[in-house]
Each structure stands twice: as C-alpha cells, then as structure tokens.
C-alpha cells in the first residue's frame, strides 16, 4: 500500500514553517493519542503515521531529502547511507509538549504537591442590632484536622514515610511509545514521591482526622447581608502537612420589625393622625440608640421624609455614619364616635365641601385638571 504524503498527513503546505508543522502535530497527536483512544486500532495507526511525518518534516536534512526523493529517500537501498535506518532514533518530544500532555494524561513535571486543605463556609444569621454594633460569636464546625499522633505525616509514631521505589521520589514516571514520551503521575505513590509502610493507627495513613472545633468569631460593626469574613487557616487541614484551607463566615442579617436598611441608612415609617399632620407637634420615634423626639411641622403631607443625621449605620470600611430617615404616614381614623363624626362633618363643611379645595392644594390642582379634561372633550 502506497504511503501517504507527509504534508498531507499533517494538513500543511509544502512551504509550511516549522512552527506551523509543530502546531499541526500537537493538534493531531492529542486527537489520536492512544491514551484517548484505547482499543481503537485505526487511531493507533494514524498516531504512528503522524509521528513519522512529524519527525521527517522537522529535521532539516530529512525534509530536504523527502522533498527531493519522496518516501524513496528512506527505503533500504535508496539514497546512499540513508538516515540511520529510518525512524529508530528515539527522538524525545517532551520539549515540544511540555506539560500539555502531562495535564491531559495525568502527568506534569516534578513531584505532586500534597493538597491544600479545603475552604469551609459557615452561614451566620445576625440581628440588625448585632450587624450595626458588631458582635463576637462562638461557632462550632465539623472539619478535618491534622492528626495529633503523626502530626500530619500519616506514618506510625517513630517512623517516617519512605521514598517511592517506582519513581525514586519524583512522583512521576515516564511512559515511552516509540519516539513519544509522556510523563504520568506515579501509580504507586499517586504523585507524592513517598509511601507509608506503617500507617498511623489513628488516621490510618491519611494524616487527618474528623473533628468538631469551636471558634470565636469577631463580627465588625457595620456588616450587611452578603459580607464575608475570612478566617485564614481555619478550614480543613491539608494532606500530609500541607497548609490548611480558610473558613469563610457568610453574613445574613435578619429582617427587622421596624427598620429597613439601605446601605448605611436606616428607614422607618412613623404613623401620625391627620390632626397632628395639619397642626404639627412632636412624636416619639425609635432609633438604635434609644428613643428621640421628632418635630412634625404643621401641614405635613403623608410620605414626607424626615432625616435624623448620624442615627444610621457606621460604615464597616470607615467613614461617615449613615442617617435614619423617618417616613410619615397620615392615617385615616377608624372607630369614630358619633360626636367625632359630627365634628368631622362640621370640619368638612368648613372646607367648602368634600374636595376641600381651599385648604387642599393638591385637590384643587387635581379637580382643576379634571374640569379642563372634560371641557376639552366637549369642544
């Protein structure tokens, strides 16, 4: 069967530069690599074909001979002397791929580091008062901690982990297929470079044990829902002495019966009767620091906001303290006595009717607009 053209195999032109050839080879080699196509004979044959084409086209001498004589340049009895018997030179492709195949096929260079401990998250519910003023709380969390018998090594007390005889402590083994070499994680030690001959009786060689621990967490003043507090090194212990992870405390502020928070400002609704709204007066309102008197001017309309400076939340990042904004809500009276109803009827008549346009600017404006609307319709 006639051999395919090397340029055609790699999908490059006859004038392709070496970097184009390397790029094409990487792409095709990853696609047809035996580790990715186990048991696929067709893929294995293509992979060998791709390697052969690559070795010729990246060797200046061999490429020149191939361009002049084709496949005949490498056949026995072909060009004088040949090129060392074809493709048995054992070229090392690890410089081309570096860690590319290492990542794909479980390799990588050097000993695999022991894994850092996992980060943990704890959801903490706070009242608004706790969030505004700050608080210290104790929490209890389940975690993995370093074994106190072997101190994280996993080995029996008085012994040490031994160097792996398979990889000689490197954590890696090299698999070679013809000209192609791939580094893989040592299957004997799982990349650690050491083996535990006599495991610790408490952690059974893991170096970590399950425990619950109690921590005191200081919550700074001014935190809000969504804020996270990081406690470095308070997560799970790392494997075999590796650094511990971190603990993240996630803040959730409970709903308050009186106040709503927006940033560093607090809002509350203050109900008043229509007599106070009309005549003015003082009313007691709550703040997080205690009760204060709010002066309501005469002719106050419902929805009006009164700002009490410095009665809000102090920023957790420093800076000025927020304000308390009181929204006045004028309530319609209910449960009126006959006397009260009569007084209101007399008051209504003094306003000049139900609309009370003389004493109600918004009513006058509204009904003037309604009158104009109907006048325009009838024209």
From Swiss-Prot:
CDD domains: DnaJ, DnaJ_C, DnaJ_zf. GO terms for molecular function: ATP binding; heat shock protein binding; unfolded protein binding; zinc ion binding. Pfam families: DnaJ, DnaJ_C, DnaJ_CXXCXGXG. Induction: By heat shock under the control of the HtpR regulatory protein. Gene3D superfamilies: DnaJ domain, Heat shock protein DnaJ, cysteine-rich domain, Urease metallochaperone UreE, N-terminal domain. Zn(2+) 1 binds at residues 147, 150, 200, 203. It is found in: Cytoplasm. SMART domains: DnaJ (SM00271). A zinc finger (CR-type) spans 134-212. Zn(2+) 2 binds at residues 164, 167, 186, 189. It comes from the Bacteria. The keyword Membrane does not apply. Residues 5-70 form the J domain. Its cofactor is Zn(2+). One of its GO terms (biological process) is chaperone cofactor-dependent protein refolding. Keywords: Chaperone, Cytoplasm, DNA replication, Metal-binding, Repeat, Stress response, Zinc, Zinc-finger. GO terms for cellular component: cytoplasm. Binds 2 Zn(2+) ions per monomer. Belongs to the DnaJ family. The J domain is necessary and sufficient to stimulate DnaK ATPase activity. Zinc center 1 plays an important role in the autonomous, DnaK-independent chaperone activity of DnaJ. Zinc center 2 is essential for interaction with DnaK and for DnaJ activity. Homodimer. Participates actively in the response to hyperosmotic and heat shock by preventing the aggregation of stress-denatured proteins and by disaggregating proteins, also in an autonomous, DnaK-independent fashion. Unfolded proteins bind initially to DnaJ; upon interaction with the DnaJ-bound protein, DnaK hydrolyzes its bound ATP, resulting in the formation of a stable complex. GrpE releases ADP from DnaK; ATP binding to DnaK triggers the release of the substrate protein, thus completing the reaction cycle. This is Chaperone protein DnaJ. The gene is dnaJ.
